[in-house]
Swiss-Prot record:
The keyword Ligase does not apply. InterPro entries: Acetalactate_synth_ssu (IPR004789), Acetolactate_synth/TF_NikR_C (IPR027271), Acetolactate_synth_ssu_C (IPR019455), ACT-like_dom_sf (IPR045865), ACT_dom (IPR002912), AHAS_ACT (IPR039557), AHAS_small-like_ACT (IPR054480). One of its GO terms (biological process) is L-valine biosynthetic process. It comes from the Bacteria. This is Acetolactate synthase small subunit. It comes from Synechocystis sp. (strain ATCC 27184 / PCC 6803 / Kazusa).
Length: 172
């Protein structure tokens, strides 16, 4: 199972290197990694997606806490949270199919950020499922390049379960 970990760290040089080293020494893979400033100026939030069972993630969490600059580690996999990812995708789009590519981007509430004679570059923001869905739809046109930020997430203070909300949407 894939787990989403939110790690607060002191914003100092070498912190990310130590965390990556910990994963490498233990043979763990990081599938997604996003780092940025947190709510306090001297603290950064690292959001990572890692595969593993409950015992593995518990062991990994304990190991992370042993690192000097780690403030807090939270497995937010089962916690209601807001998840987002940013993706840029460059798609083949010549004159005959350009309108269809642009229309598809609009359906996904994506933005066209560049157009050339042969390509359209699309900016997509949303949950990881949206990224997969639009890539599947764009594949028939020919995907030239993809750049993704990796997932970022914050716990929902409301405690509302997003999956529950999605199930309600499908009923209306």
């Amino acid at each position: 199972m894939k787990h989403t970990l939110s790690v607060l760290v002191e914003d100092e040089a070498g912190v990310l290197t130590r965390i990556a080293g910990l994963f490498a020494r233990r043979g763990f893979n990081i599938e997604s990694l996003a780092v940025g400033s947190a709510e306090q100026g001297d603290v950064s939030r690292i959001t990572m997606v890692v595969p593993g069972d409950e015992n593995t993630i518990e062991q990994l969490t304990k190991q992370l806490y042993k690192l000097v600059n780690v403030i807090k580690v939270q497995d937010i996999t089962e916690t209601p949270c807001v998840e987002r990812e940013l993706m840029l995708v460059k798609v083949s789009a010549n004159a005959p199919n350009r309108a269809e590519v642009i229309e598809l981007a609009q359906v996904f509430r994506a933005r066209i950020v560049d157009i050339s004679e042969d390509t359209v570059t699309i900016e997509v923001v949303g949950d990881p499922g949206k990224m997969v869905a639009i890539l599947q739809m764009l594949a028939k046109f020919g995907i030239k390049e993809v750049a993704r930020t990796g997932k970022i997430a914050l716990v929902r203070e409301s405690g509302v379960n997003t999956e529950y909300l999605k199930s309600l949407e499908s009923k209306f």
